[in-house]
Amino acid sequence: MIPFSHCIRNLLRRPGQSCQLIAGSCVVVLLVMTAASMNHAMKQTLGNTGDPLNTIIVGAGSEESVERSEVKQGVAEIIGSSISGIRQIMDKPSLSPEIHFNGMLSTQDGKSSQALIRGVQHVALWVHQRVRILEGRFPNPGEIMVGRLAHKKLGFNRSQLQIGQILVFNGEELIISGIFDAIGTVLEAEVWVPLQDLMTYTQRENLSCVVVTLDEARSFGDLDAFTKRRLDLELVAIQETEYYTKLSTFYKPIRWMAWICAFLLSIGALFGGLNALYASFSSRIQEFGAIQAIGFNRWKILFSLIVESSITGLIGSLLAFGIVVLILQGITVPFSIGVFVLNFTQIILALGAGTGLVLGVIGGLPPAWNCLRPSLPETLRAA
């Protein structure tokens, strides 16, 4: 077997080509890991948002989008008095009548951006139990409460969404009264407004939905039966987890686009690496002949060349790991209903290492085999 140190020396003898191959491997591994992290983060964020005990009551025909839903006022009281399996807190049912509205928010300096605005009452904190008020308090009339990551979704500076700052919505100036989080969900990129205020600002008479927290998941059947029995109310009950699972399915093509872009760019980098390896190995044909002449067969030389190219792939992976840990880890990526945070898990890092290794093997095999095909006399006579 050819010594491992021989492979290292060959890489050091051609630092320019080695750096080129390592950089190409780094780019490919980085693209693959970023695509994997985006897929995982978006899917996990949408999955975390749904509570298995929560049910969303929407208008019939609006199961795909709460924003398009219309639910009559008073439905929450009717449900609270008709269903026995609703969780009670302080002898009151956990029912949150809400309006979900996509609208433009502006800062005082005129910068505008579209936000997901949720009109709620205090009881929303009972229903959405992941929500925690970090600073300030729940909004009173003329005030709003913003999510911890709302500035990422809106593209504003963090300082513009601090307590006491003013945002403009539909010509009304609203004072930020609090900041909340809901770790790992899309909620923490939202803006919450008192329900009655939002109905006034948007001139709406109906709700978007009613979110109900049940004592246990099996109580959903009673709630579902109620909506089917009361045809006059035109309601549909959908479990919150199912709603966000459908949203995740809706965004699946976007997640696939990330993979497709990473794949196409990786193919380009792979061909560039193949070209560099062909040039590198072709200039060493005489060296391969000399190694065969002293007793090493072609298979051992082939293995040595694959090890050599695999080393560049693994070094590229290590560089990609460094970029991921120092720069990309924790970056927030906005999308239409919120933001997700890139998280490079151990599985994703293992995928990156495997990609670098496979890239080295696949990239090194064709040029190595092409250079080892000539007979020993032809190899020794090669210029």
Model-derived regions: residue spans:
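Short cytosolic juxtamembrane segments of multi-pass membrane proteins
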Residues: 370-383
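Transmembrane alpha-helical interface segments in multi-pass membrane proteins
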Residues: 278, 286-332, 351, 355, ...
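Short beta-strand boundary microenvironments
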Residues: 114-157
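Hydrophobic, regular-secondary-structure patches
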Residues: 26, 30-114, 135-137, 200, ...
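A short amphipathic helical element positioned immediately N-terminal to and/or at the very start
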Residues: 3-12
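Hydrophobic alpha-helical transmembrane segments of multi-pass inner-membrane transport and secretion
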Residues: 15-42, 252-287, 310-319, 362
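Mechanotransmission and gating elements of multispan inner-membrane complexes involved in transport
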Residues: 83-86, 106-112, 138, 150-152, ...
